[in-house]
């Protein structure tokens, strides 16, 4: 190896260890990136070919006799916008006015994006876009656009049904013609064979052409669902750079009118997000926007009988309810052409603005702690930890009963007859007394915070203390409340509900359906799943334009479509995971039982298996630094910049691979030449962080931690060794949040690991000690069975068979905890929500059923779930995992079979709502 290669190797190894410069947030600091994600390359190509600017200026001159938008006064601008929106207020009786609606909506979109032809740089265009979107909001254009969006979805579904009926009729006619032709051939004599041969040949040719059309219409096999595999669009590329005749091109494109309307809605949302009054406008009902679609009776049935101040009356739906309705139709109506990426982006952005983003949530948490005088740096010690620490001492013994699970510390302390309440403990050293005083005054959580967020998260308190009832913990210890006390209002009738509480009231009976649909979309969008053939159609927005007769798509168009589709899936994954994390975090802040309900839905829907599957990449660095984009095809590309703004140099590269181990797509998308000439030292390719994949990775780790934390049954339902091997890859990534949450999840898995695993992975255990906050009495390093045996010895000294019954006792405690939690969740919903709805036959369900595919012990081949042998080994306490290689990881060998099983479990065609 020469000197140049050695120096290159050292520089690359040094650069790969540099910290990834990425800040985790749900709002992009640069609004240009959010707008770029909204448009696919194929959509931008269609908009360029449609010549919108010339048509817009022609229409503007006819109506205002002026040639530029900036020449208009504010009154003239409002008049022209009302003129365009006036077309949307007309009755849409069919497909006759579709082109006119599409043209006028494109004019409004052209104005909303800043009238690009009249701007000189990006900053000016973004400023004009904000002014125009504020103007659209002032003339109340958003409700009218939403009504048009609902009508366009109905037209799209009606057109789809008509096409299916026509295809069925054509198929029946062809079958009848074939039967008649066969009968004629049988009845005619042999002397007329020549004429019959000619007729038969003509009929056969016609039938072949018709059958080809029908196969596209029925979308058999891969094209049946316009599935999300790149191989569905790109197949068998010849050496000449053209597609072979066997390639199947998806001729179905997402509805253009719905796409352009969602673009306008998204631009209005992001340009008015700083206005506090806009939050209420998002949740305001639309008068006269009644949807008569029979496929969404769940929303129409959730009507409050006595309270409408929360915005839950779905006779007049709002922006969020309409988008959720489109999301439901996308899953239920087979073969629809909804632009699902835009639907998810609008839903995520509207929820973030209405409920508050992650930064707003952190600010609200800090305000809540400041109001009760709780400092963030206070030691988070619980009374349960202190009592266990005292009982674990060998010299002094507790005077409490052995079956006491949780008690206060003001009992007989350290064997002395004195209770410490407001005075020091008798005959104790001053240092120990001061330490106990600090622990007593800084218990976690404080009493004032308990009143606001509920009592201890997992409280099985057997003492006589009564937790005060507030609006946040209404049902706690209901048996201890005397009938003379004033009855507290249920949460659905409180005077000033939070925005998340209003959203929760509106969708309380549909959360199970919403979560499962999002998980199905996430499964279709994750890059780990190869050759996806499920029911979710993600490729309708990425379509190669039909070429002229006698020619085919070029190699450049084919590769552009492939990169566009990979980028498309990354954006969908980011939006889907962002919605799930936002709902989970707000539910935990609002009311803890709402969080338990949503996390239980995710767990019972096999979300843990899916999230681990999303993290199981062969090369994590390749995934985090993938370059699935074409800078020249972005909406805000470098070519549109003037020379003055493009003079700044690009940021330095973070990772520079020595060889072309990546795919040709990455080489083309990053602008490099790739492996040219097969040289030994090809030029390095500059790769930067993929912020979309970084966000998806951190969000997946956060969701795993929130779903399984403090739930031993959920942790033990998956193979701890296989899960840890996947997470070990992310511990080596030099990003603080990725390391922190991967170590947090591994910390939950350590008690279920073997001694050999702990010996091999001492580096990870040391990192957990250094980086993960640990409670004073957290015995996370103990084996799970050993900890259970110690508890059994403390609770019952006469039991001689603790080792044989440890697992059974653990299962009993776990089942009791899950059952108790489920009972509290059901009681909470019954008292606070269910009895205040006018049901009209509606069965409000607050738990998933096994018919929806939530069995955690159903076998999935070669997955994270426990096999029958592993379950038997755990029951006999003889399980031993063998790690041949420290860097080994789980590889899903049969993705198609596992996905098929997941789809069978996620059959929600007839949900129980």
From Swiss-Prot:
Range of residues in the leader sequence: none
Domain of life, source organism: Eukaryota
InterPro entries named in the record: Far11/STRP, Far11/STRP_C, Far11/STRP_N
Region of interest (Disordered), residue spans: 177-204, 791-814
GO biological process: cytoskeleton organization
One GO CC term, this protein: cytosol
Biased composition (Low complexity): 177-188, 195-204, 791-811
Coiled-coil region list: none
Family membership noted in the UniProt record: Belongs to the STRIP family.
PANTHER family xrefs: AT25231P (PTHR13239:SF4), PROTEIN REQUIRED FOR HYPHAL ANASTOMOSIS HAM-2 (PTHR13239)
Protein name as it appears in the record: Striatin-interacting protein homolog
Gene: fam40
